[in-house]
Regions:
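N-terminal, motif-rich segments that launch catalysis or mediate targeting to/interaction with membranes
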Residues: 1-60, 69, 74-166
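Positively charged, low-complexity nucleic-acid-binding target-recognition regions
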Residues: 66
């Protein structure tokens, strides 16, 4: 599979108490490095249209991953993938709850869901636009630590969890 070489680009792990800047980097690449490479290829006048289109699609996906906190989670539990929980009594894991289960439970298209989200104030938009990828990684990491504290192993999560965390 030609996509296998990008698998390490979907997450970034570093120890609790460290920052991305001070952490040891994955030699295969990580989320931050993947975003940077995509940006470089998209902006490179020597890149052909096919490369630019592929890397633009990948960049959009990686930015989505960056904003799902467990993609900046702990290596030892694979970003919550080994933390078993229940979602409306069905077996799953914490990562899956945050990747898909909460979104699917709204039973809306992504367009409908985005239309129903709270909008940002002008000041919030400006702060987001001034942010860097590293700012977003650090924010996502802080949120990941809160996500870890939000559920216990084998806990049954449902509407209350969605209300509190989505």
């Amino acid at each position: 599979n030609s996509y296998r070489k990008y698998s390490s680009w979907h997450y970034v792990n570093f120890e609790v108490g460290e920052t991305y800047e001070t952490s040891e980097k994955n030699p295969k690449g990580d989320l931050v490095q993947g975003i940077k490479i995509c940006q470089q290829i998209i902006l490179d006048p020597k890149s052909n249209d096919e490369e630019k289109i592929f890397h633009l699609k990948l960049l959009v996906h990686l930015l989505g991953d960056l904003h799902q906190p467990l993609h900046t989670g702990k290596a030892e539990d694979r970003g919550g993938n080994t933390i078993k929980v229940k979602w409306f009594r069905g077996k799953t894991n914490l990562h899956s709850v945050w990747d898909t289960k909460m979104i699917e439970s709204y039973n809306m298209t992504y367009t409908e869901l985005s239309d129903n989200l709270d909008y940002f104030s002008k000041n919030q938009k400006e702060a987001i636009q001034k942010g860097t990828v590293i700012d977003w990684v650090n924010e996502s990491r802080e949120l990941a630590m809160m996500v870890y504290d939000s559920a216990k192993i084998d806990q049954n999560l449902s509407y209350r969890y969605m209300y509190d965390h989505f």
